[in-house]
Structures are given as structure tokens and as C-alpha cells.
Regions:
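Conserved N-terminal catalytic core of the sugar/cofactor nucleotidyltransferase
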Residues: 2-7, 15, 29, 33-103
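Conserved alpha/beta core of the MobA/IspD/sugar-nucleotide pyrophosphorylase nucleotidyltransferase superfamily
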Residues: 2-5, 159-244
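A glycine-centered beta->alpha junction motif in the catalytic cores
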Residues: 13, 254, 280-315, 339-355, ...
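Conserved core of the sugar-phosphate nucleotidyltransferase
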Residues: 111-185
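ATP-binding glycine-rich loop module of kinase domains
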Residues: 234-262, 281-296
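Active-site acidic catalytic loop and adjacent metal/ATP-binding pocket
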Residues: 241, 370-420
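Conserved kinase catalytic-core helix
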Residues: 266-272, 293-358, 363-380, 477
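Active-site activation/catalytic loop segments of kinase-like enzymes and analogous catalytic loops
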Residues: 412-473, 490-504
Length: 521
């Protein structure tokens, strides 16, 4: 018989706080893919999965269909999934019709290292922990479960922490207990049905367990599962890039963002990967052979990349967009968006626009700095085909094929899918040379924001410093305006500060403001 596995994902994941604002708790990232991927891949390829859907359930379904088109999933909608009448027991009862056979139950925040045995017997999984108070426990005698206790009732060493993983062989007995259990069954979940097995035999199985259901435990799991040499992706709450089974899946909470990304992939054909699947909040493409430029860059290779970019930028826009409308778009994209993002930064991080010195240098308010910029000069862009987020972490180099591939292209430029400003791409390249994503991911920076002073410092790679020097001379040699590139680079830091995690956000703001003030001098 094919193994059937029940994974309830209906809950809101409130213990994870802001991490589940935009995604279901099973889609929270761990080792550059959702926790749910780690669960799915613990089971044989022919296993069938019964998924209880609730909070942001459409995202769970869409992800599974994109990531695992050759696996079998059965879905049950849970309503209500929060508030009065909700509970894990309700999620299970909604799945009953698909679980009329022995099955595995696994919580969507449970990861284990060991192979998971089939439900040839009734069994419950446990792990050794130092503090039992926050877990349901089971009393184990001679390898068998003789009692199941609610939180705070277990005692070391006789009781073991139940980890939300179990084999249900006697499913008919289980379902009878769940249906007759009323509110207690709804609240207790699978444990209510499992209590019906006591006296009939429940094996206790030990596992190396990683809980991902609360922030401290999730952090431990992320550390344990982290692989060296992985991609350097700076975390955002409303976006993600997942690597699953040779595929790359891009998520955003913004459906227009995803739709336009997919449309632009066709416009950038030959420079970016081909999109192979699209859902409302995600798209998929095959993983591309190569290494990110930040890992392999040398000055000669950087020069080769810039030659490739010149070819990319050489295409004139096909639309009839005139210079005035393009400049208006640049004004909206640069000026209006900057003021909006600065306000968002102050709101997100509870800061005010002040005159704090930055690294010992006196500073006016950021509003003063922005008001004094020559926005007409900044908005006088160069309309061409564009990438929109062109930095080394978004560029792959295949030494074998001698080919560059651009990744994570921007969805639009001031509403246009076809035409952007070459200066923005140049500034994006510059911003990645100054701030190395790899070193930021390793927390190799410092920032301190006090009442009257901001201090920051960051590590840089010598090769990127050399590339920056070369880039500045290349910009001038090829007829571009270096001052404009550096001014836009500073604006980029100010713009993205609102979108990144604390305290990196403070570093970006301090760097952007100080760089902008210095460029103005």
C-alpha cells in the first residue's frame, strides 16, 4: 500500500509573529526553501499527501503544484481555521475522507533527521529535551506509550516530549474517537484519537527533532540545516526565492509583481531563464548552471560583464514613449518613490528625520538633502532595455559555457515593462560593489543609532574595491555621468532601507544619507 501522509497547514502560525504575515507557516524559509519542502522530501516519491488548508492556503497549494508536479497531493479546506470552533482536531476531521487507511501524521513545524517508519504499527515520535513544560508529553515504559499528557504535566525522565509525528495504523479506532470527542478532540488534535490506542499498543520512536514553530527554535533549525556555499539571499518578509528539486521558485505577496516578472522574462529572452510555471504569487524556472559573480569576479571578468551589459542595453525601446513621458516616469521612480520609502523607513523602524552626525560628520535632515537635489538632472535618464536589480548576486557566470545569466529582474520601471533607465542599472551595479551581500549575510557590519549620532562600518572585499575603481573609470570612458551614477547609488540605499531587516536597514539609511550628502558637496 502506498504511504499516505497528513500534513495540517491551516493554522495562522501566530507564534512566528511577522514571519507569517505574508506566507503560511509551512512556507517559512529554512536553507533557502520552505519548511514544507523538507517535510515532503522525508517521504518516498510515491507517497501521497493529504494537506489541510486554511491560512493562506492558496499559497501552499500553488507552491506544491509548482515544486512537485510529479507528486500526489489531496487537499481539504478547513473553515474556521482561527478563532472559535477552530483547532487541529477540526483540520484532521476535514481530512478524514482521504485518510481511510493507515497513515502518517506530521505537524508542519516538525523536522527530524532519521527515516520515518511506515504506519505498520501505531507509534508516536518523541525527542529528548531539557524542558518539558511547553510540550505535550508521553509516559514511556519499555518502549511503549502508556499515557499521553497535556503541557506542564510531564516529568523527566519518565515522560518524553511528543514531537507532532505519529503513525496511525488503527485508523478506524482513531476516527471513532475523534468524531465522538467533541470540543476536546477539536482542541487536542491527534492526541485525542491516539489516546484510544492506549492499552492496545503504541510504540515510542525516538528522533532527532527540530521544532520550527517559534522564533528561537526556528533559528536553531536554520543553523542546523544551513549548508555552506549556498546563495546569499537577504531575507524579506514579503518576498522569497526558494530552491527545490532543481527548480527556482520566486514568491511575492504582490500578484502584479509576479505577473509582470513573468511577462518581462519573455521580453528579456536570451538574457534570463525561461519561466516554466506561473501562479498568482509565484513563478518557476529551471535552476541555471553557473556561479554568482560575487564568488568568481575578477577585474577582467567584470569588464567582460560590462561588455555583455552594453549589448543588453543597446536595444532601443520599441514603444513610442517620448522623452517627456520617460522623464516623467523617471521623476516618479526616483523622486516620488524615494520620499515614500524614506517615510516608510521612519515608520517601520520608529525613527525621526533628524540631524544626527554620521560617522562624525555633521548632517542636515534627509529631507533637506533630498530637497536640495537637482531632480531634473537625475530624471534625465537614458531609455533602454533594463534589468532593474543588476548586482552580482543576480548574475550567474558559467565558466564552462562562457555565458552570463541575469536573475531576479525588476518587474517594471515606473510602470513600463519594456523601458527603463540605464543609469539605474549602472547604479545597481555600483551599490553591490560597495555593499557585499555575502558579507552582510555573515553580519560583517556594525551600526549604532543614538540620539545625536549614527555610527556604521562594514567589511568590503578587496576585489570589489578594485572593481569599483575600474567601474568608475569605465563609466567615464564610455560617456556616462559618474556623478549621476553615484547619486543614484545613494538613493538606492535610502530606498531599500525600508525593505530590509533590522539593523541592516539602519546601515543602509546611514550609508545612503551620508553618501548623498557627500556627493552633493
Amino acid at each position: 500500500m502506498v504511504m499516505r501522509v497528513c500534513i495540517p497547514t491551516a493554522g495562522t502560525g501566530s507564534r512566528l509573529k511577522g514571519l507569517t504575515k505574508y506566507v503560511n507557516k509551512s512556507l517559512v524559509g529554512l536553507d533557502n526553501r520552505p519548511i514544507l519542502s523538507h517535510l515532503i522530501e522525508q517521504f518516498p516519491p510515491d507517497a501521497e499527501f493529504v494537506i489541510a488548508l486554511g491560512h493562506k492556503g492558496h499559497l501552499v497549494r500553488d507552491f506544491l503544484e509548482l515544486a512537485y508536479p510529479n507528486r500526489t497531493f489531496l487537499y481539504s479546506q478547513v473553515d474556521p481555521f482561527e478563532g472559535e470552533g477552530s483547532g487541529l482536531g477540526l483540520s484532521l476531521l476535514k481530512c478524514k475522507e482521504h485518510l481511510q487507511q493507515p497513515f502518517i501524521f506530521i505537524s508542519c513545524d516538525t523536522l527530524v533527521r532519521e527515516p520515518i517508519p511506515p504506519p505498520e504499527k501505531n507509534w508516536m515520535g518523541y525527542a529528548e529535551v531539557d524542558d518539558l513544560t511547553q510540550y505535550r508529553t508521553m509516559l514511556v515504559e519499555k518502549g511503549a506509550v502508556v499515557d499521553i499528557c497535556e503541557k506542564t504535566l510531564g516529568r523527566i525522565p519518565t515522560h518524553k516530549a511528543y514531537i507532532g509525528l505519529a503513525g496511525i495504523k488503527d485508523y478506524e479506532i482513531f476516527w471513532k474517537a475523534m468524531e465522538e470527542g467533541g470540543k476536546q478532540a477539536i482542541d487536542s488534535g491527534e492526541a485525542h484519537g491516539q489516546r484510544a490506542f492506549i492499552g492496545r499498543g503504541i510504540d515510542a520512536h525516538a528522533f532527532t527533532w527540530f521544532d520550527t514553530g517559534n522564533p528561537p527554535a526556528l533559528e536553531k533549525a536554520r543553523t542546523a540545516y544551513e549548508k555552506s556555499g549556498g546563495p546569499n539571499i537577504l531575507e524579506k518578509t514579503n518576498e522569497a526565492i526558494w530552491f527545490v528539486d532543481g527548480q527556482v521558485i520566486k514568491f511575492s505577496d504582490d500578484q502584479t509583481f509576479i505577473a509582470n516578472r513573468a511577462k518581462r522574462a519573455a521580453l528579456l529572452k536570451g538574457f534570463v531563464p525561461e519561466i516554466t510555471g506561473v501562479k498568482s504569487n509565484m513563478y518557476r524556472y529551471a535552476e541555471v548552471e553557473g556561479r554568482v559573480m560575487s564568488d568568481v569576479v575578477t577585474v577582467p571578468l567584470f569588464e567582460k560583464l560590462l561588455q555583455h551589459c552594453q549589448t543588453f542595453w543597446s536595444e532601443e525601446p520599441k514603444s513610442d514613449q517620448d522623452k517627456v513621458s520617460f522623464k516623467n516616469g523617471c521623476m516618479k521612480f526616483y523622486k516620488d518613490k524615494t520620499f515614500e520609502r524614506v517615510d516608510l523607513f521612519f515608520k517601520n523602524f520608529e525613527k525621526k528625520d533628524g540631524t544626527e552626525s554620521i560617522n562624525g560628520v555633521s548632517m542636515p535632515t534627509v529631507k533637506t538633502v533630498l530637497d536640495n537635489l537637482d531632480w531634473n538632472w537625475i530624471a534625465d535618464g537614458l531609455p533602454r532595455r533594463f534589468h532593474g536589480d543588476l548586482h552580482f548576486e543576480n548574475i550567474l557566470w558559467s565558466g564552462k559555457k562562457q555565458v552570463f545569466t541575469f536573475l531576479d529582474w525588476r518587474q517594471d520601471f515606473a510602470g513600463s515593462l519594456t523601458t527603463g533607465d540605464v543609469y539605474y542599472d549602472l547604479a545597481k551595479l555600483m551599490h553591490g560593489l560597495i555593499v557585499c551581500h555575502e558579507l552582510i549575510a555573515q553580519d560583517m557590519y556594525q551600526v549604532k543609532w543614538e540620539d545625536k549620532a549614527i555610527h556604521f562600518d562594514l567589511h568590503r572585499k578587496q576585489m570589489l574595491v578594485e572593481c569599483e575603481r575600474f567601474f568608475e573609470s569605465w563609466i567615464v570612458k564610455n560617456g556616462y555621468d559618474l556623478a549621476k551614477v553615484r547619486t543614484l547609488t545613494a538613493l538606492i540605499y535610502l530606498n531599500i532601507a525600508a525593505l530590509h531587516h533590522y539593523p541592516y536597514s539602519l546601515l543602509l539609511f546611514g550609508l545612503g544619507k551620508s553618501m548623498l550628502a557627500n556627493e552633493k558637496k
